């Protein structure tokens, strides 16, 4: 499946970002394009994005400050 021409292949679909929440807190996520992560401030976790796919598993998340 190819990404639309108006966004890079490794980016996440904006519509998907609107509906995703942190699996731990059910709170909002912030997209960090530079690090390719979804940030949950309330859980203090950063979920990785691999090949444009968010990995929403707490055991795969990186702890943040």
Curated annotation (Swiss-Prot):
Entry GO terms, CC: cytosol
Disulfide bonding pattern of the chain: none
InterPro entries per record: Trm112-like (IPR005651)
Organism superkingdom: Bacteria
Pfam families: Trm112p (PF03966)
Classification via PANTHER family: PROTEIN PREY, MITOCHONDRIAL, ZGC:162634
HAMAP family, per the entry: UPF0434 (MF_01187)
Family: Belongs to the UPF0434 family.
Protein name: UPF0434 protein BBta_0300
Provenance organism: Bradyrhizobium sp. (strain BTAi1 / ATCC BAA-1182)
């Amino acid at each position: 499946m190819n990404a639309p021409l108006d966004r890079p292949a490794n980016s996440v679909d904006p519509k998907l970002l609107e509906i995703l929440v942190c699996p731990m807190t059910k709170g909002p996520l912030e997209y960090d394009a530079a690090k390719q992560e979804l940030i949950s401030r309330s859980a203090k976790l950063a979920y990785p994005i691999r090949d444009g796919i968010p990995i929403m598993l707490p055991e795969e998340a990186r702890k943040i400050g």
